[in-house]
Amino acid sequence: NCPYCVVYCCPPAYCQASGCRPP
């Protein structure tokens, strides 16, 4: 899981895979 998804979204593929969204 992306530890920075609240402030910064990981690379798009990882962001999507981890269920995070860009701010």
From Swiss-Prot:
Alphabetic keyword roster: Disulfide bond, Hydroxylation, Secreted, Toxin
Tissue and organ expression note: Expressed by the venom duct.
GO CC term, one of those recorded: extracellular region
Leader peptide range in chain numbering: none
GO MF annotation list: toxin activity
Residues bearing PTM 4-hydroxyproline: P12
Domain of life from the UniProt record: Eukaryota
Localization: Secreted
SS bond list: C2-C10, C5-C15, C9-C20
Comment, domains: The cysteine framework is VI/VII (C-C-CC-C-C). Displays a mini-granulin fold, a structure composed of two short, stacked beta-hairpins connected by two parallel disulfide bonds. This newly described fold is derived from the same cysteine connectivity as knottins (ICK fold). The name 'mini-granulin fold' comes from the structural homology with the N-terminal region of the human granulin.
Note: Negative results: Does not affect sodium channels Nav1.2/SCN2A, Nav1.7/SCN9A and Nav1.8/SCN10A, acetylcholine receptors alpha-3/CHRNA3 and alpha-7/CHRNA7, calcium channels Cav1.3/CACNA1D and Cav2.2/CACNA1B. Does not impact cell proliferation.
Similarity field: Belongs to the conotoxin U superfamily.
Protein name: Conotoxin Tx6.5
Protein species of origin: Conus textile (Cloth-of-gold cone)
